[in-house]
From Swiss-Prot:
This is Biogenesis of lysosome-related organelles complex 1 subunit BLI1. Belongs to the BLI1 family. Keywords: Coiled coil, Endosome, Transport. GO terms for cellular component: endosome. Residues 75-108 form a coiled coil. Component of the biogenesis of lysosome-related organelles complex-1 (BLOC-1). It is found in: Endosome. The keyword Oxidoreductase does not apply. Component of the biogenesis of lysosome-related organelles complex-1 (BLOC-1) involved in endosomal cargo sorting. It holds the Pfam family BLI1. The gene is BLI1.
Amino acid sequence: MTWKAGMKERVLRQHIEGCIDQVQEYVDLESAQAISSFESKAVDHFRCLDGLKAQYNTREDKISEFKRLQSEYATKVDGLEKSIEHFEKLSEEIEEFLVELEVKTKLASKRQS
C-alpha cells in the first residue's frame, strides 16, 4: 500500500467515523425527543385515567352499597319471616284458647240453666 493510498484510507475512515458520529447524534436526539414525547403523553393519559377513575369510581361504590343494602334487607326479611311464624303460632294458640273458652262458656251456661 502506498503512502497516498494509506492517506486516502485514513481520511475515508475519519470521514466514516464523522458520519457515524453524526448519525449517532441524530439517533440520540430523535430517541430523546421520542422518549420525552412518550413520557409526556403517558403522563397526560394517566391524568386522564385518574380523572375517569374518580368520575366512574362511584359505580363500584354503588355496587358495594347495593350489596350491603341487599344483605341488610335479606337479614330484615329473615327477621320478618321469623316474626310471622311466631305470630302465626300465637294466632293458632289464641284460636285454640277461644275454642276452649267457647266450650267452657257453653258448659257454664248449661250448668246455670
